[in-house]
């Protein structure tokens, strides 16, 4: 067996169907496009959502909602992520960014109560959920809003 003798196993590769290459192929002549009409022409076809001139569904339905330009998006950290820090550490947004717990500061950091905190930590963040604040204090640490 040499490299040039390698072949894929029988039936593992299917040959591509080349359309418009003779009647005998079964896909010659019209090449699967049918007879005449917009879709048979080169470059033919209609844009997505086009309904033959009828008002399209997306235009028949009303617009809804708006984007609040003053929206604040906080970087979210759950309690179980804080277990990676040593006992007694002061956890700040800068430290979370440095250690890769969060990738961006955004509008600040919000601590959420998912998971269980097993260490006594001083956590400084822009926001805390009620359950997160409770859990930090229950573990003997402090939760400071900055």
Swiss-Prot record:
PROSITE patterns recorded: RIBOSOMAL_L15 (PS00475)
Region Disordered, residue ranges: 1-57
The record's listing under InterPro entries reads: Ribosomal_uL15, Ribosomal_uL15/eL18, Ribosomal_uL15/eL18_sf, Ribosomal_uL15_bac-type, Ribosomal_uL15_CS
Organism's domain of life?
Bacteria
Q: Does the keyword Ubl conjugation apply?
A: no
Pfam families in the cross-refs: Ribosomal_L27A
Biased composition regions of type Gly residues, renumbered to the chain: 21-31, 42-52
Which keywords fit this entry according to its UniProt record? Ribonucleoprotein, Ribosomal protein, RNA-binding, rRNA-binding
Provide one Gene Ontology cellular component. Answer: cytosolic large ribosomal subunit
Q: Which GO terms describe its molecular function?
A: rRNA binding; structural constituent of ribosome
Subunit record text: Part of the 50S ribosomal subunit.
Family (UniProt): Belongs to the universal ribosomal protein uL15 family.
Q: State the name under which the record lists this protein.
A: Large ribosomal subunit protein uL15
């Amino acid at each position: 067996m040499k490299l040039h003798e390698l072949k894929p196993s029988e039936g593992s590769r299917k040959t591509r169907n080349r359309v418009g290459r003779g009647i005998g192929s079964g896909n010659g002549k019209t090449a699967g496009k049918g007879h005449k009409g917009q879709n048979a022409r080169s470059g033919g076809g209609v844009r997505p959502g086009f309904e033959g001139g009828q008002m399209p569904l997306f235009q028949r339905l009303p617009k809804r909602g708006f984007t609040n330009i003053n929206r604040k998006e906080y970087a979210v950290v759950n309690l179980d992520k804080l277990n990676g820090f040593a006992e007694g550490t002061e956890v700040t947004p800068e430290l979370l960014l440095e250690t890769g717990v969060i990738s961006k500061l955004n509008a600040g950091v919000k601590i959420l109560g998912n998971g269980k905190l097993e260490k006594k930590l001083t956590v400084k963040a822009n926001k805390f959920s009620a359950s997160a604040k409770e859990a930090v204090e229950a573990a003997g640490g402090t939760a400071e809003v900055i």
